[in-house]
Amino acid sequence: MAEQQQQRSLSAELQELVLVALGAVPGALLRWQVALHWADRHLLVNVLGAALLGLLAGLPAAPRRQLLVGIGFCGSLTTFSSWMVDAMQLISAGQIAEAFGLIGLTLGLGVGAAALGFWLGQRLRLLKLPRSEP
């Protein structure tokens, strides 16, 4: 019995790992393409990721969707560390106001995007859409 539960647990973990990986690949590819074509790349991907995570939070719970889109896609799309390096580079260059402007703008837009996404998810939830996995 214990071996059977352990085997099922390993199988479930492997399925979860695959979902995260399947979401991470397109998220990373989108982030890479945004970095190639937009100067404010970190602002764009972080705000987009916040909006999408807000939407997911507003929808009915769906663990597989959270793994695929929330952790996989959004996790590989968004970046905290690169955003902080951008701010530190501005500070190092003596552009302190610009650094704090970048931080404030990203936080403000990110929270606003997450709130808008959550609001939209709640509205979609009210439509009583069928729960899908993922």
Curated annotation (Swiss-Prot):
Main location: membrane
Gene Ontology BP annotations: cellular detoxification of fluoride
Residues annotated to bind Na(+): G75, T78
Record comment: activity regulation: Na(+) is not transported, but it plays an essential structural role and its presence is essential for fluoride channel function.
Presence of keyword Cell inner membrane: yes
An annotated Gene Ontology molecular function: fluoride channel activity
Protein localization: Cell inner membrane
Swiss-Prot/TrEMBL keywords: Cell inner membrane, Cell membrane, Ion channel, Ion transport, Membrane, Metal-binding, Sodium, Transmembrane, Transmembrane helix, Transport
Listed Pfam families: CRCB
Reaction catalysed by this enzyme: fluoride(in) = fluoride(out)
Record bears the keyword Transferase: no
Topology of the protein relative to the lipid bilayer: Multi-pass membrane protein
Membrane-spanning intervals of the chain: 10-30, 43-63, 67-87, 100-120
Gene Ontology cellular component annotations, sorted alphabetically: plasma membrane
Family listed: Belongs to the fluoride channel Fluc/FEX (TC 1.A.43) family.
Function: Fluoride-specific ion channel. Important for reducing fluoride concentration in the cell, thus reducing its toxicity.
HAMAP family given in the database record: FluC (MF_00454)
Name this polypeptide is given: Fluoride-specific ion channel FluC 2
Annotated organism of origin: Synechococcus sp. (strain CC9902)
Taxon lineage: Bacteria, Bacillati, Cyanobacteriota, Cyanophyceae, Synechococcales
